[in-house]
Amino acid sequence: MSGMSALELIRIVSRDSPMALAQVARVRAELAALHPRTRTEVVAVKTTGDKWMGDLSKVDGKGAFTKEVDAALLAGEADLAVHCVKDVPADRPLPAGTMFAAFLKRDDIRDALVHPGGLTLDELPPGTRIGTSSVRRVAQLAAAYPHLECVPFRGNANRRLEKLAAGEADALLLAVSGLERIGREDVITEVLEPETMMPPIGAGILALQCREGDTGLIETISELGDPGTHREATAERMFLHVLQGHCNSPIAGYARTERNGELSLRASVFTLDGKTVLNAHEWAGRLDPATLGTSVAVALLRQGARELIDDIPH
């Protein structure tokens, strides 16, 4: 490929949910700003995870949202895939022949409370039903707010808001970045700091995946990447990889680039009843991001994280 002019068309594969298509729109806009002559088109696929409304651990967990997307990439039906890092399984490598070419600048990592009556999490009365199927949220609520009740809630953010309006729960916990992507930040009652509700690994990060051999495309796409986000994603994914966490694990954590430019990683592993919480927090110092992730994972394993993770069916 001679120069970037060779890339006339980039086919982007995506789940066909409103959230996923909003993510693709961001990628197309950022590409257009850098390479106005490159056209993009969207190849939409329905994934197992989108079609299945039951328990995710029954259909390959997190992989339920990525398998069909990976297949389109490997079959050459598309050139680029957009993933939420939090939905990409870290307990196994990316499909052979594919790689992440870039991590976009990170969005808000925090969770939001949506309560039609406008109450904050601290103000919710005992017995309030919180709609969430995330073991990470269930465990943290059980630990800090045992008087609240969690009811299983699946479906995309729009669907969950509909179910809330229909009275299937009294309040919801949703990612701030997800609500922003679909233009529904108006429903947020309270934004929860990570100290209150620790986010999932990879929160608010979009990763761009392509085939390893597409050097011209990789070169183009890597220009969209954000170096700080790349370091954070690398530390977080290595952390999850060493812990061998699965989609049903109550693991939470986030890397943060401190004001002095140094990377830190804070993470926790919980029991579902919230009675046991293991914590670790380290600064990188001279360590590279992957080594930082390994170090924090090892600190949690020393505290008994393996038993907590393996106790949960997946």
UniProtKB/Swiss-Prot annotation:
PROSITE patterns: PORPHOBILINOGEN_DEAM. Tetrapolymerization of the monopyrrole PBG into the hydroxymethylbilane pre-uroporphyrinogen in several discrete steps. GO terms for biological process: protoporphyrinogen IX biosynthetic process. HAMAP family: Porphobil_deam. Pathway: Porphyrin-containing compound metabolism; protoporphyrin-IX biosynthesis; coproporphyrinogen-III from 5-aminolevulinate: step 2/4. Belongs to the HMBS family. It catalyses: 4 porphobilinogen + H2O = hydroxymethylbilane + 4 NH4(+). Its EC number is 2.5.1.61. Monomer. This is Porphobilinogen deaminase 2. It is an enzyme of class 2 (transferase). PANTHER family: PORPHOBILINOGEN DEAMINASE (PTHR11557:SF0). Its cofactor is dipyrromethane. The lineage of its organism: Bacteria, Bacillati, Actinomycetota, Actinomycetes, Kitasatosporales. One of its GO terms (cellular component) is cytoplasm. Binds 1 dipyrromethane group covalently. The porphobilinogen subunits are added to the dipyrromethane group. It comes from Streptomyces avermitilis (strain ATCC 31267 / DSM 46492 / JCM 5070 / NBRC 14893 / NCIMB 12804 / NRRL 8165 / MA-4680). GO terms for molecular function: hydroxymethylbilane synthase activity. The modification S-(dipyrrolylmethanemethyl)cysteine is found at residue 247.
